[in-house]
Regions:
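Non-catalytic, polymerase-adjacent accessory regions of viral genome-replication enzymes
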Residues: 1-40
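Electropositive, glycine- and tryptophan-enriched low-complexity nucleic-acid-binding patches
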Residues: 86-106
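Duplex nucleic acid-engaging cores and interfaces of nucleic-acid transaction enzymes
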Residues: 81, 85
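Residues immediately flanking
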Residues: 91, 135-137, 229, 268, ...
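Conserved polymerase palm-domain catalytic core
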Residues: 46-64, 68, 100-104, 108-262
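Intein modules and their embedded homing endonuclease domains
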Residues: 38-41, 45-48
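Active-site and adjacent loop segments of nucleotide-processing enzymes
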Residues: 269-321
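Conserved phosphate-binding loops in nucleotide/dinucleotide-binding enzymes
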Residues: 73-79
Length: 321
């Protein structure tokens, strides 16, 4: 009996999730509504490409958005068709990987939030953990080592087709409006699969602090370690550097502070028993600072065909006439 990597039903469920999340068009300029107008055909094309090993993702569309602090963040947006496939794979691997994640991890996880992370910090303070290492990993999403990440994925995911897809997405092409480049390191922010891969990569850090007996709270690449003395904080600091060195990462900022002096984490100010939320801390819609001009998709597909690469999909827009 033939088994399929992803059944049509799985792709249907994935599309509904993509549709609920809204989102803009990718490099092919196909919107969610345009994809849906050829729904059956588009999903069937994806189904065939995936199960005949012809699927190839389109380049990611690199845009720049305002972080709200005067800096810009690059987001790499997959085409709708690729978001569907990534979401379908995510729905397969998420239950497997979520079982492995630690309780100290709050970012990008269903049923977990910034509010819960803040509450956890308060609980540790009330238990006497008043010294804090406040750390932020330098350019985490840009510096993730693909070889190390794939090794970690293989510890839990054994399906070679799924592993192959994840590797394809990690080594994605990126269109920035001028050239197409290939991602050599890092996890592209903006892809459905990226958050769970980020948590998997940093799970080793979570485990190390859990085993040390420290109180540890991590939200994505931003974490704090809570200790009962400055001496304990120094030991935790050393462990932090050792683990990040193994992961080929470095800290951007790192401070040992106390609740008496106060510190800021996840946009919240902690001072002694007080938790202060700045007045202007509101969820703002991220302003797009740069949106690249369209990529010539016909020329791109011709180049792909000439190189022997197939599976970039048929046109997803409604046919005229």
């Amino acid at each position: 009996m033939k088994t399929y990597l992803l059944e049509i039903e799985a792709l249907c469920r994935a599309f509904e999730h993509v549709k609920e999340n809204h989102g803009s068009a990718g490099v092919d300029q196909v919107t969610i509504s345009q994809f849906e107008s050829c729904y059956d055909e588009n999903l069937y094309v994806l189904f065939c490409e995936l199960n005949e090993n012809r699927y190839r993702p389109l380049p990611l569309l690199k845009i720049l958005v305002d972080k709200g602090n005067g800096e810009a963040r690059a987001l790499c947006i997959p085409a709708v068709r690729d978001r569907v496939v990534q979401t379908a794979v995510l729905q397969i691997i998420s239950p497997i990987l979520e079982r492995e994640f630690e309780d100290c991890s709050f970012g990008y996880r269903r049923g977990r939030s910034v509010k819960q992370a803040v509450q956890r910090v308060r609980e540790y303070y009330e238990r006497g953990f008043t010294w804090v290492i406040d750390a932020d990993i330098d350019a985490f999403f840009d510096r993730v080592d693909h070889t190390l990440l794939l090794q970690k994925v293989r510890q839990y995911i054994t399906d070679e087709k799924i592993l192959g897809l994840i590797e394809l997405w990690l080594k994605a092409e990126i269109w920035d409006g001028k050239t197409i480049t290939t991602l050599e390191t890092g996890i592209p922010q903006g892809s459905p699969i990226s958050p769970i891969l980020a948590n998997l990569f940093l799970d080793e850090l979570d485990e190390a602090f859990q085993n040390m007996g420290c109180c540890f709270v991590r939200y994505a690449d931003d974490y704090i370690v809570l200790c009962k003395s400055p001496e304990e904080a120094q030991k935790a600091r050393q462990l932090s550097h050792e683990i990040l060195d193994k992961l080929h990462l470095e800290l951007d900022e790192e401070d040992v502070v106390s609740f008496d002096h106060g510190f800021k984490y996840l946009g919240v100010i902690f001072v002694r028993s007080m938790t202060l939320v700045p007045y202007d801390r509101k969820k703002r819609e991220r302003k797009v600072l740069y949106y690249p001009p369209p990529l010539d998709m016909e020329a791109y597909r011709r180049r792909q065909a000439a190189c022997g690469r197939c599976g970039c999909g048929r046109p997803d827009k409604p046919r005229e006439g």
